[in-house]
């Protein structure tokens, strides 16, 4: 979108061991509304995101003056409701993943307890400390185990990556 990083459509399909979710949201950013497949209309603020686009949107922020402990919020529409996704900056560090060592910024998205997570601090995300701001690593504890996601390759970046030699 030429006006900004706006969400226009979201589709979610989950089928895990009998647990099923089917969600379709159409966002009308100018009118400030979200339309659901249940034919419900929800009032939302301009620039609202969904659970996936919120993380892409966060990559557009200027983190040059961010301080450890700073929290920023992104209005997010999830599971037929609006909430402010709060993301806490934990600091800068060098991390090692299979692809090498990188200068990174660590963030903790303050997640909703009880659905998947025991504690609101159970998700940790590291993004490259450069103008690309690509996700390098994510770790989370969930009610029935843990998940780890790691960058395995990258190409076509607009800027030099923060890889440590």
Question: What is the predicted function of each stretch?
Answer:
Residues 1-27, 63-165:
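Acidic, serine/threonine-rich low-complexity disordered tracts
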């Amino acid at each position: 979108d030429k006006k900004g990083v706006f969400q226009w459509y979201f589709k979610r399909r989950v089928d895990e061991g009998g647990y099923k979710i089917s969600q379709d949201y159409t966002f009308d950013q100018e009118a400030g509304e979200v339309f659901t497949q249940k034919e419900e209309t929800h009032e939302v603020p301009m620039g609202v995101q969904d659970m996936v686009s919120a993380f892409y949107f966060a990559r557009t922020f200027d983190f040059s003056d961010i301080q450890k402990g700073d929290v920023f919020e992104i209005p997010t529409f999830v599971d037929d409701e609006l909430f402010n996704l709060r993301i806490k900056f934990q600091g800068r560090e060098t991390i090692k993943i299979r692809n090498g060592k990188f200068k990174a910024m660590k963030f903790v998205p303050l997640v909703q307890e009880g659905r998947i997570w025991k504690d609101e601090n159970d998700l940790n995300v590291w993004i490259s400390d450069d103008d690309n701001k690509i996700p390098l690593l994510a770790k989370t504890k969930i009610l029935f185990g843990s998940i780890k996601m790691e960058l395995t390759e990258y190409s076509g970046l607009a800027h030099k990556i923060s890889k440590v030699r």
